């Protein structure tokens, strides 16, 4: 006698070694889908008649399965679950919620923004707490947001994409940015970081050091990111204004909005300087739309010569902006 156990999530997929045995007389347990009797003409219910040579089931705890295995029946089972299979279940569950849930079906990318922000902060709290249980739960909540947004994108009338497209984009990015590690090469930390940054720069093809800086993030994180980009681009330190490097907090001042305004103004200055440097490099006889040469490395002298405003500091006070914005 033989017991064939299939994966309950994919009950119509059977192990290849079981195929020859399913051509004859087969019984199946009641949880199996109707596709079983349709596909196997000789199949009948496990409760009908005498025991057939083969029992097909997706339930390892079914009484008929337990009885036959206890009597010495041979077991042919589906391969063990692979890591990540529960993600497939989560995708299917999200699809069901999106199509059948009254609340889920009405949500948009914009309506979910506050939940995404809340879950991100809750995950950060979980990391800080050191609680493994809390961390696992909050990672799941953040994963829900990823699945939800991907499922909403699938319904878009223009440029729809699926969760598989999201995963494919991620895999392509990782494959491009960490080729050495993924190829099994022995690589130093410095070389890995260099590969990553080089690939990232090639992908983004930024025209400005401020490109791809997401201004919707908290003002302090925004300031840190912009300062980091500016320093990497060789901007002299004294051109970074005090109002974004030193934050003052008081009860009667909106510190978040004040800092954000200062950072956005600094971004404007960066872009103005970059445009002026580009004009100076290409000359007045070349139209801007014909100039596709990336700025590349900007020297300290270029930053200083084309910076659109002076910086408040204790040494020289402040000067007015040149009028560029």
Swiss-Prot record:
Cystine residue pairs: none
Entry keywords, A to Z: ATP-binding, Hydrolase, Magnesium, Metal-binding, Nucleotide-binding
GO MF term set: 8-oxo-7,8-dihydrodeoxyguanosine triphosphate pyrophosphatase activity; ATP binding; ATP diphosphatase activity; magnesium ion binding; nucleoside triphosphate diphosphatase activity
GO cellular component, one term: peptidoglycan-based cell wall
KW Membrane (keyword) present: no
Cofactor(s) annotated in UniProt: Mg(2+)
Name by which UniProt lists this protein: Nucleoside triphosphate pyrophosphohydrolase
